Amino acid sequence: MNTYVAEKPAVATTLALCFAIALLEGLDLQSVGVAAPRMAREFGLSVSQMGIAFSAGTFGLLPGAMLGGRLADRIGRKRVLIASVALFGLLSIATAQSSSFAMLVVVRVLTGIGLGGAMPNLIALSSEAVPPRSRSSAVAAMYCGIPFGGVIASLIGVLLAGDTEWRHIFYVGGAGPLLLVPVLAVLLPESRAYLDVAGTRAARASVAHTLFGGGRASATLALWISYFCTLIVLYFLLNWLPSLMAARGLDRAHVGLVQVAFNVGGGLGALGIGAALDRMRASRVVGGMYAGIVLSLAALAAAPGFASLAAAAFAAGMFVIGGQSVLYALAAIYYPTAMRGTGVGAAVAVGRLGSVVGPLAATTLLAAGRSAPIVIGASIPVTLVAAVAALLLIRRPQARD
């Protein structure tokens, strides 16, 4: 039985469209961090309120990922993905129309639901479009769109000189998804692997059986812990890196360039580490990845000036963002096709708890008067916990259809 899309044009179309959606998702996810200093001045936000604004969108990602993954196994990856893209496109434009802090928070929560619903389907479609031996590379190629979308957000932020022009970032981030919806409807093929198992008993399994039955309990828990801890670090950096760099004395242009370095490193890291996972022993790749995260965070905390901060941010992006792409690839191979959407969606949802905790923890430390290096260094112990969980995960047997 074919478990992947065999035709090369269909593979290329699937991966290209998934990359484009990830690019737009990355643009939206990092738009708040880029626009935050200007939004804070317009709405008169305190540090605590900025933390709430950061976490609002990521809070919506949790139910979105769980629901999007479950529906992917029931009604198909393509349908759920199109609905999710339309939702976050409309609500990104609504973000630009926000006239108060309360409205901003509500709109960002709803935007997060759309963003969260898209990711499990992007992972499933990318991993199922290629043979099993290439799944990590395919997921990484898709996921590198996230940091490259962040590069676009950073460049837009640098180009917009006025404090009142932050809304344009969200107009761009909303128009792109809405223009892409009809393209997806016409060109995106449904996963062949999903069509082969749709309606089977496995596809109708309960959520509890999908996650914990069939010997999957330990793999599920290890995935959840590694996702949760890694996303604490990732979303702390995504949301607070511009403000922390500004607090270190960098001007707006240099802050934007540090953010660009972080995202470019992330895109290259996703491609490189994903390809390595398909070709090398997983324990070496994962161990090296987490060692790189720890060392780059230490360098980012200690860097004295712009050049060293940019270099450290590049390395941090390479290992943190690249590492998250590896975790997404691992989730795709530890659940069988009929259950992949639910399993990946649950892991993404639990990880999103970390994406809420990370910005809020940074907010708490900064509000208590802690310096930027101390806040960055505080994420290193969390990284070590994620490393242990991920190394335990790869000792588990992979799923078989």
Model segments located where?
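Helix-breaking motifs and short loop linkers at transmembrane-helix boundaries and internal kinks
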Residues: G44, G76, Q97-M103, P131, ...
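Helix-loop-helix hairpin linking two adjacent transmembrane segments in secondary transporters
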Residues: M142-V186
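Extracytoplasmic gate region of multi-pass secondary transporters
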Residues: G33, G215-A270
